[in-house]
Amino acid sequence: MATSHSLKAETRACGSGNLKQLRSQGLVPGVVYGPGFDNVNIQVDAREFARMLASAVSEHILVALDINGKIVKVLLKEVQHNPITNACLHVDFQAVTDTTVIHSIVPVILEGDSAGVALGGVLDQTIHELAIICQVKDLPEAITADISGLKLGESLRITDLKLPSGVTTELAGDVIVAIVEAPRVSGEEAAPAAEEAVAEK
């Protein structure tokens, strides 16, 4: 089952001047839209919104949005941030139902200590987020993968991921998610090793 967060919102008036005033009052302007849903301009408390994001593992989450006392199930689609302060400037929500099919992006979280890393290998995670397709009711907040069995030179591929029931991805199964690379030998370390190899011949 998908995890749902909760947030309160109020309807707001339109206008760019009004947006600046809202932000100065500690509010974040936003909009709710979706098939069969009349677009609604809203405002949410900036601190409450930031607290909700902090409790999630990504910005692609389900939210039970309380709009003036009416609960609407929404998907957080986009968060616009100030490029300098990183403050939230605007949020977009998509109204959904449990059976709405969505395209979303979720983080890939690696768990466990790789056997190869314990031997001096270097873990290189090449995919940190995964594009998935599923119904809203099946949306995971993250995809986790156990890498404790990865040895030197071994890799974790898309086909190795245990996607939750009802969740698929369009990425090919042989795409590498993470690999344990052998430690690189520096030039200074390689020279003595080469000399020893020659001396043994």
Curated annotation (Swiss-Prot):
It comes from the Bacteria. It holds the Pfam family Ribosomal_TL5_C. The keyword Isomerase does not apply. Keywords: Ribonucleoprotein, Ribosomal protein, RNA-binding, rRNA-binding. GO terms for molecular function: 5S rRNA binding; structural constituent of ribosome. CDD domains: Ribosomal_L25_TL5_CTC. InterPro entries: Rbsml_bL25/Gln-tRNA_synth_N (IPR020056), Ribosomal_bL25/Gln-tRNA_synth (IPR011035), Ribosomal_bL25_b-dom (IPR020057), Ribosomal_bL25_C (IPR037121), Ribosomal_bL25_long (IPR001021), Ribosomal_L25_dom (IPR029751), Ribosomal_uL5_bac-type (IPR020930). GO terms for biological process: translation. GO terms for cellular component: cytosolic large ribosomal subunit. Disulfide bonds: none annotated. Belongs to the bacterial ribosomal protein bL25 family. CTC subfamily. Part of the 50S ribosomal subunit; part of the 5S rRNA/L5/L18/L25 subcomplex. Contacts the 5S rRNA. Binds to the 5S rRNA independently of L5 and L18. This is one of the proteins that binds to the 5S RNA in the ribosome where it forms part of the central protuberance. NCBIfam families: bL25_bact_ctc. This is Large ribosomal subunit protein bL25. It comes from Akkermansia muciniphila (strain ATCC BAA-835 / DSM 22959 / JCM 33894 / BCRC 81048 / CCUG 64013 / CIP 107961 / Muc). The gene is rplY.
